């Protein structure tokens, strides 16, 4: 089967969606053709500002480690109820304002300790009922207006970072 976004059988071309809906369609097409563990790094996400619900309730667990998310402002519910547990440690999330329920009820437990979350205002229920147990003690959370229930029913409940205020 020839993959939709390939120049030939082994060389993927880069595609640059201009909208969230275009991005979602490319992801769905690729997963349908290659499975849930596919590599999505051929997608240039540098124009996308909203990734809300992008992988919510998905079985996707492939590679998106090289995605340029530097313009994204909304990651609400992005991986909620998903199986995703890939490497997103090098993502530039410095423009994100909303991370509420981003990993709620998800399998994610990757390293996000070096994320710049200084512009995030909403982290409520971010790790609610998730598997997350990472070290985020050095996050700059001065801008956060709402972090209620951020760690409820997660491994970090009772072991929250010092900066946490419910």
Language-model features: where?
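Negatively charged
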Residues: 2-166
